[in-house]
Design a protein with these regions (language model features):
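Surface-exposed assembly/interface segments
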Residues: 1-192
Length: 192
């Protein structure tokens, strides 16, 4: 502590760190999930939902509705949906994702090759400048030993049971992305 007449070298740094630490939890709450879905009923490419009431169920396949419900169930701030068009390749879909800001990505209907394409894309995007830049993370059941901070590997195969039905591990990635997006820094997803 500085005495009268002495200069204290870092009083504002301490205050700034305390302020940032105090607000970090508030700033971390409720992220945005982006789902990539193949849907025959949806007519557009992009959709944004803040509550399940925003979703018009008759405009979606029953399977897609289950994935949207899974992503919203644990309290994500917003769910973006990018619908894969009939003749559209993954490169085009991923290029569109570069223009959107979101935190968590899931592709519940992906086959293993599509999943690997998304894993590679996320590794390239993570930490770069741009709309999604450092924040994008991907939940995958196919990724194995990806050894990257932006890839969450759902290692348990089998069937996941939910109030919305039974799901494969890859399908359940929508729920895991929604769960993690709904968690502030002071909560753990493994105790939810």
């Amino acid at each position: 502590m500085a005495k009268v007449g002495q200069i204290n070298a870092s009083p504002s740094i301490s205050i700034e760190f305390k302020t940032l630490a105090t607000t970090a939890i508030q700033r971390s709450e409720r992220g945005t999930v982006c789902l990539i879905l193949k849907d025959k009923k949806a007519t557009g490419k992009w959709y944004s939902f803040k509550t399940i009431a925003d979703v018009e169920a008759k405009s979606w396949d029953a399977e897609s509705m289950k994935y949207i419900n899974l992503a919203m169930h644990y309290g994500a701030f917003k769910v973006l949906v990018r619908v894969v068009q009939n003749d559209e390749g993954m490169d085009k879909v991923l290029k569109d994702l570069e223009m959107r800001k979101f935190n968590w990505l899931a592709y519940p209907q992906a086959i293993e090759t599509e999943d690997q394409t998304v894993v590679n894309w996320v590794k390239q995007q993570f930490g770069t400048a741009g709309p999604i830049g450092k924040t994008v993370k991907y939940v995958s059941s196919y990724a194995n030993r990806s050894d990257h901070v932006a890839i969450v590997e759902l290692g348990n195969g089998g069937t996941y049971k939910s109030i919305y039905g039974d799901f494969t591990a890859q399908e359940y990635t929508a729920a895991i992305a929604g769960l993690i997006a709904g968690m502030p820094l002071n909560r753990s997803a493994d105790n939810h």
